[in-house]
Amino acid sequence: MFRLFFFMIISLLSLQTMAEQVIVVLGDSISASYGMPVEQGWVSLLQKKLLTQHSRYSLYNASISGETSAGGLARIDVLLNTQKPAIVLLQLGANDGLRGLSPLDMKSNLEEITRRTQNIGATVLLLSMKIPPNYGKRYVDLFYNVYPQLAQQLKITLVPFLLEDVALHKDLMQADGLHPNAKAQAILADKIEPYLLPLLQ
């Protein structure tokens, strides 16, 4: 009887080990399927790709259109406590730049989000963004350099400019010139996938 009970405990622990792992996507409109149905967005497309190879991972999309790094920082604790993610895809900063907010404050916010995530044993995948040159070269350079600086400082994986293969192609952008359209979403999913796969256990 004891052996049977012991076997059941071991089996339950094994099942728990194989339990579903959550990947939280913390982003802005780029990740929130802005201007299209949710199922057409890159997060949904990436989830479908993962299901074919890594079925125990599910994506939880916590992205909000208009979100800033400060907004993400204000929400991260609740997300970590409720979702208990294994990985956080951090795609924030673009709205900080578009509003002319301090790149130093943005860096501080992203750093704190990353540290809090790492403190629970989760991994951060940082998605870098760029902004139009409206605020001048110095501001744009300060903004963009935040991402590689953080990646090096915190030893996290960095996805180069997410919209690199999309932003300059009008047929892949919405009319506002800022948001990728539905045709571009598969490109974004394909861009992220090779950086994400090595992080999956």
Regions found by a protein language model. Name each.
Residues F2-M8:
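Sec-dependent signal peptide recognition
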